[in-house]
């Protein structure tokens, strides 16, 4: 790693267990793979938000979470959660021709089809929560304006990373097996087409993100207490890895990196590299003025024209700017505005939908 500590298979196993912890709230989905013992390891424990969400409002079961905490949770859902969903509805009304109060159509346009005709903003929020397993951090992706973290009380928002135990669970994932200091085996219960991609986990330094005194593979200790990733989260603002550059600091919209002298291929020749947060409109101008060395603007006709105007030879490669392009395999799609393309001013009518289908067929 960039601090000179050698990498071993324990770092890989630690990283996998973090990604498979019931309270993990990041974007990786290794836990969804059919790995032997995964279900048994994750059973009997979940985040408090998922537990309360699935328990439901008005529950009288206070054996795991007390009544006051449950009430505070649902009060937050009925206030901040509803506001979060209402912003989506309002956005769809303002921009997509959805009728005022038509939550069902607004939700469908946002990717949540199947709500009842008389659906409310709360119903939409519950649908969003179900999609993301009540992971408030992941639900932020659905925002139409406000951050969910600004709409929910901090203690309620934190329930999506706080563990609750309500049953028995296995102490380890039997399919994750250490076979040596630099080797391991992962056992699947069935064929998984995506396994080859999911197993490519980023190897995080256990001695930094975890706690070394809590790692003992033979005794089912994997660098942290199951259900408690607080130490992992506490150092994520100062990341450490094993790449060619190491993180120095982030301030004023700039990430500062410096060469990693411990990099396995040798230290990079460029000692310092800075990444700047940039708006699309500032990228090309930054290169022209010299505040940015390299950037990746959207390669539109306007950008091409602007580059050619800056170069004295009127080409994409000249005395001021050099352009490197690559071919990408991909696909795109066209969208049709229901506000602009409809029959009789009613974007939601069957005739309007058929018109748009006809144009797209």
Residue ranges and their predicted role:
Residues 2, 192-195:
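Primarily extracytoplasmic ectodomains and periplasmic/lumenal surface modules that are beta-strand-rich
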Residues 197-198, 347:
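Short conserved micro-motifs at the rims of enzyme active sites and ligand-binding pockets
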Residues 1-25, 81, 162, 172, ...:
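Extracytoplasmic/periplasmic ligand-capture domains
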Residues 141-174, 180-183, 187-192, 200-268, ...:
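Gly/Pro-rich hinge or "lid" segments in bacterial periplasmic/extracellular proteins
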Residues 42-56, 216-220, 236-238, 341-343:
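Short, charged low-complexity intrinsically disordered segments located at boundaries
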Residues 53-65, 163-176:
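Extracellular adhesion/glycan-binding regions together with long Ser/Thr-
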Residues 40-43, 229-235, 294, 302-304:
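A general structural signal for short secondary-structure boundary/capping elements
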Residues 1-148, 286, 348-358:
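Aromatic- and charge-enriched surface segment that lines or borders ligand/interaction sites
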């Amino acid at each position: 790693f960039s601090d000179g500590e050698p990498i071993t298979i324990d770092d890989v196993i630690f990283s996998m267990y973090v990604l498979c912890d019931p309270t993990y709230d990041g974007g990786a989905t290794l836990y969804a793979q059919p790995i032997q013992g995964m279900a048994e390891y994750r059973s009997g424990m979940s985040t408090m938000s998922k537990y309360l969400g699935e328990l439901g409002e008005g529950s009288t079961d206070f054996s795991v979470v007390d009544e006051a905490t449950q009430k505070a949770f649902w009060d937050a859902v009925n206030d901040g959660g509803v506001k979060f969903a209402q912003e989506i509805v309002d956005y769809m009304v303002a921009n997509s021709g959805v009728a005022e109060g038509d939550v069902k159509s607004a939700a469908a346009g946002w990717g949540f089809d199947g709500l009842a005709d008389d659906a409310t903003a709360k119903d939409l929020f519950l649908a969003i929560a179900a999609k993301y397993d009540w992971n408030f951090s992941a639900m932020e992706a659905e925002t139409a304006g406000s951050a969910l973290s600004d709409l929910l009380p901090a203690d309620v928002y934190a329930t999506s990373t706080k563990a609750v135990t309500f049953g028995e669970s296995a102490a380890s994932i039997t399919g994750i097996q250490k076979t040596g200091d630099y080797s391991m085996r992962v056992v699947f219960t069935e064929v998984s087409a995506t396994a080859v991609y999911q197993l490519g986990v980023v190897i995080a330094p256990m001695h930094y993100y975890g706690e070394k005194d809590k790692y003992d593979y033979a005794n089912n200790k994997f660098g942290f207490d199951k259900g408690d990733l607080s130490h992992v989260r506490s150092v994520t603002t100062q990341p450490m890895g094993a790449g060619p550059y190491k993180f120095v600091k982030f301030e004023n919209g700039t990430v500062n990196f410096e060469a990693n002298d411990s990099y396995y291929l040798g230290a990079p020749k460029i000692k310092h590299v800075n990444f700047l947060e940039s708006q699309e409109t500032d990228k090309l101008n930054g290169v022209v003025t010299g505040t940015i060395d390299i950037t990746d603007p959207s390669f539109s006709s306007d950008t091409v024209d602007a580059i050619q105007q800056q170069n004295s030879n009127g080409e994409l490669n000249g005395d001021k700017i050099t352009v490197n392009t690559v071919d990408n395999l991909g696909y795109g799609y066209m969208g049709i505005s229901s506000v602009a393309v409809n029959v009789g001013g009613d974007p939601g009518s069957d005739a309007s939908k058929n018109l748009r289908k006809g144009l797209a067929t």
